Amino acid sequence: MKKLTSLFPLLFLIPLLASCAEEKQVYIVYFGEHKGDKAFHEIEEHHHSYLQSVKESEEDARASLLYSYKHSINGFAAELTPDQASKLEKLAEVVSVFKSHPRKYEAHTTRSWEFVGLEEEETDSDVPRRKNDADDRFRVGRNFLKKAKHGDGIIVGVLDSGVWPESKSFNDKGMGPVPKSWKGICQTGVAFNSSHCNRKIIGARYYVKGYERYYGAFNATANKDFLSPRDPDGHGSHTASTAVGRRVLGASALGGFAKGSASGGAPLARLAIYKACWAKPNAEKVEGNICLEEDMLAAIDDAIADGVHVISISIGTTEPFPFTQDGIAMGALHAVKRNIVVAASAGNSGPKPGTLSNLAPWIITVGASTLDRAFVGGLVLGNGYTIKTDSITAFKMDKFAPLVYASNVVVPGIALNETSQCLPNSLKPELVSGKVVLCLRGAGSRIGKGMEVKRAGGAGMILGNIAANGNEVPSDSHFVPTAGVTPTVVDKILEYIKTDKNPKAFIKPGKTVYKYQAAPSMTGFSSRGPNVVDPNILKPDITAPGLYILAAWSGADSPSKMSVDQRVAGYNIYSGTSMSCPHVAGAIALLKAIHPKWSSAAIRSALMTTAWMTNDKKKPIQDTTGLPANPFALGSGHFRPTKAADPGLVYDASYRAYLLYGCSVNITNIDPTFKCPSKIPPGYNHNYPSIAVPNLKKTVTVKRTVTNVGTGNSTSTYLFSVKPPSGISVKAIPNILSFNRIGQKQRFKIVIKPLKNQVMNATEKGQYQFGWFSWTDKVHVVRSPIAVSLA
């Protein structure tokens, strides 16, 4: 009995010990808008009071605080236990509490601006045209850029991995004084001082508190990074120069690929750098960056206060989150309230449906499409079989070499399902030396496979897609001559190796080829709709070039992003929606310069309703299947900045309109001055330039309002036309809109109903059907996509 009694104190302590041992993590406590006009110290003390309510002492509360967001965003980031976070979430004024995590966000990793019609002319005449000028439909010459003053006066904030300030893309030669509206700073740090800012890079900051809380005090050796705004990676410099880089003659990637003039979309716009992404500690840079939510929110809060006009974010969540659990979404809403336009990448998880990032209707979500430029090499087998391949490898073969399949030349002990993958230390040098190796994609990085072939003494590599990769063949700066091939070609090569006694191969070097293929087409990697957070909002919004984009690079990183690679390049070719997003950000800067009073929603509308749905061959833009791409792939289409400057009509939306929309997705208490109505309008009635109606059972009436922004004669009449989704009736009431002044608004309804005589099979039920409608006068075509699924 005595022994049993002695256990009671221990039993009593177990829950207490468990509570003490409960792991602390970083949470963001979000309050929405600030109430009243409080000083910064008052706001921080208010945040401390909430922390103290769940902490054991004032010292503990202050030590746990990482950030107090004081400018536009009202909230804080702090170390909390799950129990403490749960208690805070129940308190008054708290909108949401959400956990940060290193794997919650990821970065979404020239000819491009010439292709869309924004190249800077070298002379005062548009003729003679240069050999590789883009099709007239994608070309505009000087007038549009001159009207926009090349973006001068507009400040673009880029939230990424920093900047390499020595790049020619960021020189300030001939630029005027820094805009008086600028309120930011040039934050100094390792290898970065105030002299690295200039009249081009007018501000730079870095945010590392969240990163250090997870990984410990910053260690330059382990982190392979700079504790400053300097970019160790290349991703940030690439995106920044794509948006607003200066024109640089004779730029090219390693090996001379894509040689020509490199320029951002708005080359005279000013650049503000917000470094919130950091190299993974003790890892190769090719594995990507870490972008912590609490650091990004601090960056957005500062960007708003600094006075940027545009924010470009080539980062997104790795899985969908409700808007109030997504720091980028919430930060962007506060930016939009200040009429800052936010463009963000759609993600690189395509072509699987429902994989999009950055789904909030106040964000311009950008997918990735192709250019008309390719890097074409060749593969010749000993039996005469020849095929063109994609290649940006600078290395060359002098003659045919024996050809082997990786599975036949591995060391003992490699797992059966990995023998074909050319993983590190898997190949047997005595069987590989001097030979071309067929390696298959799957596990391991593409660059790493080439490294392994080189380590084993191989003469070259054929990198074969597996079925899951489809027919989209990537190009990388490999360490050996390399040819990328499709699954069909892989089968032919394997058959040749199997049946020929002395198989051999020759890899031809790649070269830059223009007008190689119909463009644009959709990339396979670009994430696809539908919008899984709110299917009433059609996403993505638009698409822009994101494949094989040439732009500035970091002097601290090789083109392959591997530490053993000592090659250095001032410019690099990179792919991803990370690359398409800054294209749109650059276009936004130009539109802001021409129309400084336009709202963020008006600029989105102008870009979307003027986008192309056809390629340079005047055929529908294709998906990777070879079929016409639908709005879940390309949104409203491929962007046309010059047309967007004069869209005719726009679908505008105020900050309060976004708050009203928020009521439909259970965001009810962000702004203390706004209350949701008793009857909440459905999400599809938000005044968006596209329409999505999921699970249609009966007639649905969608409401929209357009504003006349036409130039010249203010009197105009627009007629309605429609191509309805299959099995759906779409009508407009009224079907004629007349305007007699600029700024005039007109309301209309779109009546959508299923056709009674439409017989659906089982596969059609629940599947989306697509169409479009437009308003047309004698000058403008204002086009909107439609996506409807039948219940």
Swiss-Prot record:
<dbReference type="InterPro" id="IPR041469">
    <property type="entry name" value="Subtilisin-like_FN3"/>
</dbReference>
<feature type="domain" description="Inhibitor I9">
    <location>
        <begin position="26"/>
        <end position="104"/>
    </location>
</feature>
<keyword id="KW-0732">Signal</keyword>
<keyword id="KW-0645">Protease</keyword>
<keyword id="KW-0378">Hydrolase</keyword>
<dbReference type="InterPro" id="IPR010259">
    <property type="entry name" value="S8pro/Inhibitor_I9"/>
</dbReference>
<feature type="glycosylation site" description="N-linked (GlcNAc...) asparagine">
    <location>
        <position position="713"/>
    </location>
</feature>
<keyword id="KW-0068">Autocatalytic cleavage</keyword>
<dbReference type="Pfam" id="PF02225">
    <property type="entry name" value="PA"/>
</dbReference>
<keyword id="KW-0720">Serine protease</keyword>
<feature type="signal peptide">
    <location>
        <begin position="1"/>
        <end position="20"/>
    </location>
</feature>
<dbReference type="InterPro" id="IPR000209">
    <property type="entry name" value="Peptidase_S8/S53_dom"/>
</dbReference>
<feature type="domain" description="Peptidase S8">
    <location>
        <begin position="134"/>
        <end position="645"/>
    </location>
</feature>
<dbReference type="InterPro" id="IPR023828">
    <property type="entry name" value="Peptidase_S8_Ser-AS"/>
</dbReference>
<feature type="active site" description="Charge relay system">
    <location>
        <position position="578"/>
    </location>
</feature>
<dbReference type="GO" id="GO:0005576">
    <property type="term" value="C:extracellular region"/>
</dbReference>
<dbReference type="InterPro" id="IPR034197">
    <property type="entry name" value="Peptidases_S8_3"/>
</dbReference>
<dbReference type="InterPro" id="IPR036852">
    <property type="entry name" value="Peptidase_S8/S53_dom_sf"/>
</dbReference>
<feature type="glycosylation site" description="N-linked (GlcNAc...) asparagine">
    <location>
        <position position="219"/>
    </location>
</feature>
<feature type="domain" description="PA">
    <location>
        <begin position="400"/>
        <end position="494"/>
    </location>
</feature>
<keyword id="KW-0964">Secreted</keyword>
<dbReference type="InterPro" id="IPR003137">
    <property type="entry name" value="PA_domain"/>
</dbReference>
<comment type="similarity">
    <text>Belongs to the peptidase S8 family.</text>
</comment>
<dbReference type="Pfam" id="PF05922">
    <property type="entry name" value="Inhibitor_I9"/>
</dbReference>
<feature type="glycosylation site" description="N-linked (GlcNAc...) asparagine">
    <location>
        <position position="761"/>
    </location>
</feature>
<feature type="glycosylation site" description="N-linked (GlcNAc...) asparagine">
    <location>
        <position position="666"/>
    </location>
</feature>
<protein>
    <recommendedName>
        <fullName>Subtilisin-like protease SBT5.6</fullName>
        <ecNumber>3.4.21.-</ecNumber>
    </recommendedName>
</protein>
<dbReference type="InterPro" id="IPR045051">
    <property type="entry name" value="SBT"/>
</dbReference>
<dbReference type="InterPro" id="IPR037045">
    <property type="entry name" value="S8pro/Inhibitor_I9_sf"/>
</dbReference>
<dbReference type="GO" id="GO:0004252">
    <property type="term" value="F:serine-type endopeptidase activity"/>
</dbReference>
<keyword id="KW-0865">Zymogen</keyword>
<dbReference type="Pfam" id="PF00082">
    <property type="entry name" value="Peptidase_S8"/>
</dbReference>
<dbReference type="Pfam" id="PF17766">
    <property type="entry name" value="fn3_6"/>
</dbReference>
<dbReference type="GO" id="GO:0006508">
    <property type="term" value="P:proteolysis"/>
</dbReference>
<feature type="active site" description="Charge relay system">
    <location>
        <position position="235"/>
    </location>
</feature>
<feature type="active site" description="Charge relay system">
    <location>
        <position position="160"/>
    </location>
</feature>
<feature type="propeptide" description="Activation peptide">
    <location>
        <begin position="21"/>
        <end position="108"/>
    </location>
</feature>
<feature type="glycosylation site" description="N-linked (GlcNAc...) asparagine">
    <location>
        <position position="417"/>
    </location>
</feature>
<dbReference type="InterPro" id="IPR015500">
    <property type="entry name" value="Peptidase_S8_subtilisin-rel"/>
</dbReference>
<feature type="glycosylation site" description="N-linked (GlcNAc...) asparagine">
    <location>
        <position position="193"/>
    </location>
</feature>
<keyword id="KW-0325">Glycoprotein</keyword>
